[in-house]
Amino acid sequence: MQRGWAHHDSELVNRDSGLMDSLPELRRNLEKTSLNDVVVPIIGDSLVVARHWAGDISMLFIDGGHGPVPAHSDYESWASKVTRGGFMAIHDVFPNPADGGRPPYEIYCRALDEGLFEQHSSLGSLQVLRRL
């Protein structure tokens, strides 16, 4: 979601720093949905945080970079941490390349092809998989 990438929301650019910053939007959404007591945002570089993550995850939401390296790195770093029966949601999954970037679709297919996950549900471009 960085400035200059094919897919980013220019409204998320911090006016002071000029950098993308979705944290205020996340906080507003957690407040609106009364999820502050069950969702704990961890702020940091995805790969650095994954390296130090020790526990299982019951719900993983991948909505990161749309380039091949960031998307596959997120999948490789986090998918194995989802507990059996847990969920992995991937945003911006578009089977038709004309509709959006391919890497989120590629990691979606990879998760199914590797046999670690099964399709659970979908809503628009959001695909939710369940860990086997």
Task: Describe the residue ranges of each PLM region.
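S-adenosylmethionine/decaboxylated-SAM
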Residues: M1-L132
